[in-house]
Amino acid sequence: MYGLEMLEKIKLEYDKWACLTPKNSLYDRTLVWLFLSLLMIGFIMVTSASIPVSTRLNNDPFHFAIRDSIYLACSLLAFAFVVKIPMRNWEKYNVPLFLLSLLFLASVLIFGRSVNGSIRWIQLGPINFQPAELSKLAIICYFSSFYVRKYDEMRNRSASVIRPMVILFLFSSLLLLQPDLGSVVVLFVLTFTMLFIMGAKVMQFLLLIVTASVSFILLVLTSEYRLKRVTSFLDPFADAYGDGFQLSNAQMAFGQGQLWGQGLGNSVQKLEYLPEAHTDFVMAVVAEEFGFIGIIFMVVLLLCLSFRAIKISRDALKLEARFRGFFAFGVAIWVFLQGSVNLGVASGALPTKGLTFPLVSYGGSSLVIMSVAIAILLRIDYENRLTRVGHAQIKEP
């Protein structure tokens, strides 16, 4: 009986949702379909790309696929829970989230688990949690609240950018000790673009960009590990069996895909030639199995998701809901930047960074946190629509 009641409730909710047109719907259907499409594609590609390595490591071709399905279920549960949380709660508790993220980043240096020479994960029972993913969400939440409180000051006083820079330096220092330069790049771009939309002065913005660029160059030149990554990126085939092994095989995957690809499951490079085929380099497998058309399709999905987030941000700012607007803009930049960098790395256009493709690459932390970010976007859009309805009712005679 309980099961029948649950099914009946689900049917009623679906009927209510289905009878609404996109114009009067309380949720952005396009955003939901984009989210679900990327999750579905991600599960299919992780399953395809992970079969060889899963068979070798665990004698089970679907070991990583099963784990990914668990992460997928957790992501959907997190999505369903977070979409119910009012945005005022995120604004109210932005500091505790910020401090929690900082604590996790510090803890990973003490209790962290080393994988491929980097200490980026904390063992939490059967799962590995990557605090760097939480830090991106925490930075967006904290800066959105900070910019709301300091909006006028940010536009008139040069000293107002000092606190964001100090916070960015603190997070970046902890991330570089792991080391995780990719996440540092994401945080830098997030901070600068949010400063830009806040109306920071042009000279401030240019000074920050120059400072960041010089810092990045120094970080590369003073680290043999990072320098090797850059030099191997410039010519991966010069040391195809050494530092350039991963990039050279990724580029071969792109080349073999040609226009239409080899077909789902027919990738050669995933047969233990391409390391991390189901994580950071899953887009190389997409390119080999679905070709140039497949990559274009993924880019279109990424752009649609990013532009949808920007539209939600613009709508919120028009309604004078600055926290919601800044938050949505931060998520838009995060999604677009991380997807672009991942694709650039996989295609050989950028040095390897260790960043996942949003909602597609294998990785529980990335999948759950990104799903939470999309749920917040949906919540922002929902509150925007409620605000517009309220304004319309007030204007009625």
Swiss-Prot record:
Major place of residence: membrane
Whether Transferase counts among this entry's keywords is yes
Q: What class of enzyme is it?
A: transferase
Transmembrane ranges? 31-51, 62-82, 95-115, 127-146, 159-179, 180-200, 202-222, 281-301, 326-346, 357-377
Among the GO biological process terms of this entry, one is: peptidoglycan biosynthetic process
* Top-level lineage group: Bacteria
Catalytic reaction(s) noted = [GlcNAc-(1->4)-Mur2Ac(oyl-L-Ala-gamma-D-Glu-L-Lys-D-Ala-D-Ala)](n)-di-trans,octa-cis-undecaprenyl diphosphate + beta-D-GlcNAc-(1->4)-Mur2Ac(oyl-L-Ala-gamma-D-Glu-L-Lys-D-Ala-D-Ala)-di-trans,octa-cis-undecaprenyl diphosphate = [GlcNAc-(1->4)-Mur2Ac(oyl-L-Ala-gamma-D-Glu-L-Lys-D-Ala-D-Ala)](n+1)-di-trans,octa-cis-undecaprenyl diphosphate + di-trans,octa-cis-undecaprenyl diphosphate + H(+)
Q: How does it sit in the membrane?
A: Multi-pass membrane protein
This chain belongs to which protein, by name? Probable peptidoglycan glycosyltransferase FtsW
Pfam families per the record? FTSW_RODA_SPOVE
Task: Provide Periplasmic-side residue ranges.
Answer: 52-61, 116-126, 223-280, 347-356
Q: Any idea which UniProt keywords this protein has?
A: Cell cycle, Cell division, Cell inner membrane, Cell membrane, Cell shape, Cell wall biogenesis/degradation, Glycosyltransferase, Membrane, Peptidoglycan synthesis, Transferase, Transmembrane, Transmembrane helix
Role of this protein: Peptidoglycan polymerase that is essential for cell division.
Which pathway does the UniProt entry assign to this protein?
Cell wall biogenesis; peptidoglycan biosynthesis
Q: What is its EC number?
A: 2.4.99.28
Q: Please give the GO cellular component terms listed in this UniProt entry.
A: cell division site; plasma membrane
Quote the NCBIfam families the UniProt record gives.
Answer: ftsW
Family assignment from sequence similarity:
Belongs to the SEDS family. FtsW subfamily.
Query: What Gene Ontology molecular function terms does this protein carry?
Result: lipid-linked peptidoglycan transporter activity; peptidoglycan glycosyltransferase activity
Cytoplasmic topological domain ranges are 1-30, 83-94, 147-158, 201, 302-325, 378-397
Q: Where in the cell is it found?
A: Cell inner membrane
Show the InterPro entries listed in the entry. Cell_cycle_FtsW-rel_CS, FtsW, FtsW/RodA
